[in-house]
Design a protein with these regions (language model features):
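Conserved glycine-rich Rossmann-like NAD(P)H-binding loop of the short-chain dehydrogenase/reductase
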Residues: 28-45
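Short, small/polar-rich loop/turn modules that mediate ligand/substrate recognition or access, typified
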Residues: 176, 181, 233-235
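Conserved glycine-rich cofactor-binding loop
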Residues: 14-16
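C-terminal substrate-recognition "lid" of short-chain dehydrogenase/reductases
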Residues: 214-240, 245
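Alpha-helical segment proximal to the catalytic Tyr-Lys
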Residues: 127, 173-174, 231
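Catalytic loop of short-chain dehydrogenase/reductase
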Residues: 138-163, 168-177, 189
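Substrate-binding pocket helix/loop in short-chain dehydrogenase/reductase
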Residues: 98-99, 106-111, 203
């Protein structure tokens, strides 16, 4: 299937890594739909930038922590663009708080916004991908989420991101017979606007590569995983950390 016939849905696509992915896919001829919750101005700017590349852009306000919003989101994209060939889960807030100071509401928020949307959306797009006999699902976790180490300051976030790995491997197993791959990208420190630059620079000494990752580094991995050249890559967890954590 040529890229001009393909449709991508990106959560958290108004800014940062999600925006970078959308712009790259637009340059490749994909139709790009993305959702946003509060970044209305950024969403408008991103949609306009996608259209300058000659691609179709569809920006949809949605709260992917809500199952009904996910249903509306998928239905809208399918109706407007004819289907969904790739789901790219970029949305997911990050919050630092000691586990001993965590609240029930704060704990629930991390799962509602990081893990649950991956399930909500996968169950909605999978039947459409099965029907088209092709599909890609890519989700963002976090570096060392597969190592099960103690994380006293980001416990809820870490466990939610770890859950994405298990969920994605299960989906990969179930969907493989239908020419659908499901993979995870686990970034370390990437300069995407979601974390203060001074905080990133403090971590530089722990990165063997000697520099902070950029949005384009993440985009390159997504670009490969979406390609037909990556058809045999399934259930993988790609570490995008410059060697951090080794």
């Amino acid at each position: 299937m040529p890229n001009a016939s393909r449709v991508a849905l990106i959560t958290g696509g108004a800014k940062g890594i999600g925006r970078g992915i959308g712009l790259e896919l637009a340059a490749q001829g994909w139709a790009v739909a993305f959702c946003y919750r509060t970044s209305g101005d950024s969403a408008g700017e991103t949609a306009a930038a996608i259209r300058t590349k000659g691609a179709t852009a569809l920006a949809i306000p949605a709260d992917v922590s809500r199952p009904d919003d996910c249903e509306r989101l998928v239905a809208t994209v399918a109706a407007e663009l004819g289907g969904i060939d790739a789901l790219i889960n970029c949305a997911g807030p990050y919050r630092r708080v000691s586990l001993l100071d965590e609240t029930v509401a704060g704990w629930q928020e991390m799962f509602d916004n990081n893990l649950h949307p991956v399930f909500y959306l996968a169950r909605l797009v999978a039947p459409r991908m099965i029907e088209r006999k092709w599909g890609r699902i890519i989700s963002f976790s976090m570096a060392n989420a597969d190592q099960g180490v103690a994380q006293p300051q980001i416990t809820a976030h870490y466990i939610a991101k770890s859950g994405i790995l298990i969920l994605s491997r299960t989906l990969a197993r179930l969907l493989a017979p239908h020419h659908i791959t499901v993979n995870v990208i686990s970034p370390g420190f990437v300069s995407s606007g979601s974390a203060p630059e001074e905080e990133l620079q403090k971590m530089l000494k722990n990165i063997p590569a000697g520099y902070i990752g950029q949005v384009d580094d993440a985009v390159s991995v997504v670009k490969f995983l979406l390609s037909d050249e990556a058809r045999y890559v399934n259930g993988a967890n790609v570490h995008l950390s410059g060697g951090w954590g080794l």
